[in-house]
Every structure is written in structure tokens, then in C-alpha cells.
Curated annotation (Swiss-Prot):
A zinc finger (HIT-type) spans 305-336. One of its GO terms (molecular function) is zinc ion binding. Residues 33-51 have a biased composition (Basic residues). This is INO80 complex subunit B. It comes from Homo sapiens. Residues 1-71, 124-150, 246-269, 286-310 are annotated as: Disordered. It is found in: Nucleus; Nucleus, Nucleolus. Component of the chromatin remodeling INO80 complex; specifically part of a complex module associated with the helicase ATP-binding and the helicase C-terminal domain of INO80. Interacts with RP9. The gene is INO80B. Induces growth and cell cycle arrests at the G1 phase of the cell cycle. Proposed core component of the chromatin remodeling INO80 complex which is involved in transcriptional regulation, DNA replication and probably DNA repair. The modification Phosphoserine is found at S97, S99, S127, S130, S132. One of its GO terms (cellular component) is nucleoplasm. Residues 213-245 form a coiled coil. GO terms for biological process: chromatin remodeling; DNA recombination; DNA repair; positive regulation of DNA repair; positive regulation of DNA-templated transcription; positive regulation of telomere maintenance in response to DNA damage; regulation of cell cycle; regulation of chromosome organization.
Length: 356
């Protein structure tokens, strides 16, 4: 973590800390990790005056010791050990080369000196107080891995691994639907249809009889014939495709290729009958050489004037027939007159209705 040193003035050598100068070592600093930033000097002029006064006055009695420091070691959020260590200064054994790890601390607080060997002894005591829980954690993880590997080996021997070669996971039935739960219970209740095949070790092959040999030769001969037939068909299709392409490019049309396939000439078009209907009338055309059908007999036109109403004296043409007498009538009035005349009624032929 941090080492606090006092930088040499001119020669760059390490000097022993004077009273009022402190050097503090933490656990990580003892191992050489991490460095604090250089602190700002405070009251520089006053400090120089005080320093000269102390040199003139000579050695004085050391001030009472400050409260001890408490070192706490944490790894992974767990406290590994706690040790109370008094603040101290490092007494160098001799002059050394200047180090970049020299930071000036507040020099106004006097500290008592502690040898570095004593501090290392304290660190050793802290390491012996409580064992590191990381060993237990690593041991626990190793035990879990060994247990899982053993379970995997057991499942491999029993053939209980899944398709991916992993251990089969236990299915929580509470997370399944009713249909999935029913299918799972059905699969568990029914025995597996797959049975292990018997492995024949060192068994001689069955002896082949003469009939079996003949059947085998017959099957081989049929396979050879089918292969030759397929090769011949493939060759014919290739020849036909090439011939068709050449005929199409030489004669310039599908008709030429079709005629050449059929007999070397194009087929004549089939005779067609054409029917046209227009405002001037309807026509029916036949190709040459095809006899036309006989003329359709025309419907005779009605001769004579149209029939008139059967009521005497009525000049109107017939519009409908009477449902009772069957006579031609033209209106409702003629219908009534016809009923009176044919069926009898109070009014005779001289009725005034006839005049109208």
C-alpha cells in the first residue's frame, strides 16, 4: 500500500527520520505494492525555523506514543485477521540510493521508531492467527467439481447421459402444465420399447445353402440388368434432347421438331368452322373440301290476319283465352259478356254492354 520516506536534500541518500517525521507501512506496502501520492508541504518556512531550533536545542525527551494502529486484512469481503500495531518509523541500516517511492509526510508529529524486523515478526504473527478462508473456499470448490465428475462417470457407465453427453436434469413437475405432466407420467409408466441388441462375439456366420446362393445370384443379375436399362434410357434421353435442340435451331420452330419426330413432315392443321354474328346477320363458314350441311328449314310465317276477340261486335285482337269456354278474348268486359252468352244470364245478346 504505502511507504512514507523522507527525500534526501542534496546527496540523494536515505537519512534517518528525525523526531517529528513519520513513516507508516501497511500490509500491502510490506510486500511492495501500491504507492501513495506525494503530499503537499505545509508551513514550509515555519518548519525550517523549527528544524533549526531543534538542532540548536539538542536532543530532547521523546513525546508520549500515539495510539496504536489497527491492521485489518480483508479478502473477498471476509476479514482474515486483525492486529494492533503501534505507529513507528523505519530505521535504515545505511545509506541507500534514492528511490522513486519517497513521499514526504507531515513532519510535525513525532513518532517512535520500530525496527523493520519487528514489524515483519508482527505480520508473521497475524498470518498465524487465523487461517485464510480462501483455502476452504478453494477446497470446497474442488470437492464439488470432483463430486460432479464422479456423478458424470457413474451416469456414463449406466448410460443415463442425454444426447449432448450431459447429465440429465431433474424435471420439476410443478412447473409443467397438466398435459406435459400427463405425458411425462405416461412415458415413465410405459417400458422402453428399445431393447439392447445381443452382441455375438466370435459366432461363425450361418452356412449358406445352394438355394440361398442361387437367390443371391438372381438378385445380383437383376440389379445389373436394371443398371444397364437405366444407363440406356439416360443415353436415349440425352440423344433425343440434343436432336431436338439441333432441329429447333435448324428449322426455326417447334412445329418442325414435332413434325420430324412424327415422320419427317409437319402435320396439316385441323379443319375449323367459323361462326360470326353481327348486325347484318350471322354467318357460318366452312373450310374448302368440307361439305356444308343441308339448309335449315325456315319456319313458315303465319298467314292471314291475327285472330280477334270472339265476342260479337268486338274489333280488338285476341289477347288471351277464356279459362272456362276457351274463347278468344281481349278484356275483362268481353270476358263477362262471353260468360253471359255461353253460360246464360239475366242479360242476353241485346245487352247494352255490347254497344260499349
Amino acid at each position: 500500500m504505502s511507504k512514507l520516506w523522507r527525500r534526501g536534500s542534496t546527496s540523494g541518500a536515505m537519512e534517518a527520520p528525525e523526531p517529528g517525521e513519520a513513516l507508516e507501512l501497511s500490509l500491502a506496502g510490506a510486500h511492495g505494492h501500491g504507492v501513495h501520492k506525494k503530499k503537499h508541504k505545509k508551513h514550509k518556512k515555519k518548519h525550517k525555523k523549527k528544524h533549526h531550533q531543534e538542532e540548536d536545542a539538542g536532543p530532547t525527551q521523546p513525546s508520549p506514543a500515539k495510539p496504536q494502529l489497527k491492521l485489518k486484512i480483508k479478502l473477498g469481503g471476509q476479514v482474515l485477521g486483525t492486529k494492533s500495531v503501534p505507529t513507528f518509523t523505519v530505521i535504515p541500516e545505511g545509506p541507500r540510493s534514492p528511490s522513486p517511492l519517497m513521499v514526504v509526510d507531515n513532519e510535525e508529529e513525532p513518532m517512535e521508531g520500530v525496527p523493520l524486523e519487528q514489524y515483519r515478526a508482527w505480520l508473521d504473527e497475524d498470518s498465524n492467527l487465523s487461517p485464510s478462508p480462501l483455502r476452504d473456499l478453494s477446497g470446497g470448490l474442488g470437492g464439488q467439481e470432483e463430486e460432479e465428475e464422479q456423478r458424470w462417470l457413474d451416469a456414463l457407465e449406466k448410460g443415463e447421459l442425454d444426447d449432448n453427453g450431459d447429465l440429465k436434469k431433474e424435471i420439476n413437475e410443478r412447473l409443467l402444465t397438466a398435459r406435459q405432466r400427463a405425458l411425462l407420467q405416461k412415458a415413465r409408466s410405459q417400458p422402453s420399447p428399445m431393447l439392447p441388441l445381443p452382441v455375438a462375439e466370435g459366432c461363425p456366420p450361418p452356412a449358406l445353402t445352394e438355394e440361398m446362393l442361387l437367390k443371391r445370384e438372381e438378385r445380383a443379375r437383376k440389379r445389373r440388368l436394371q443398371a444397364a436399362r437405366r444407363a440406356e434410357e439416360h443415353k436415349n434421353q440425352t440423344i433425343e434432347r440434343l436432336t431436338k435442340t439441333a432441329a429447333t435451331s435448324g428449322r426455326g420452330g417447334r412445329g418442325g421438331a414435332r413434325g420430324e419426330r412424327r415422320g419427317g413432315r409437319a402435320a396439316a392443321p385441323a379443319p375449323m368452322v367459323r361462326y360470326c354474328s353481327g348486325a347484318q346477320g350471322s354467318t357460318l363458314s366452312f373450310p374448302p373440301g368440307v361439305p356444308a350441311p343441308t339448309a335449315v328449314s325456315q319456319r313458315p310465317s303465319p298467314s292471314g290476319p291475327p285472330p280477334r276477340c270472339s265476342v260479337p261486335g268486338c274489333p280488338h285482337p285476341r289477347r288471351y283465352a277464356c279459362s272456362r269456354t276457351g274463347q278468344a278474348l281481349c278484356s275483362l268486359q268481353c270476358y263477362r259478356i262471353n260468360l253471359q252468352m255461353r253460360l246464360g244470364g239475366p242479360e242476353g245478346p241485346g245487352s247494352p254492354l255490347l254497344a260499349t
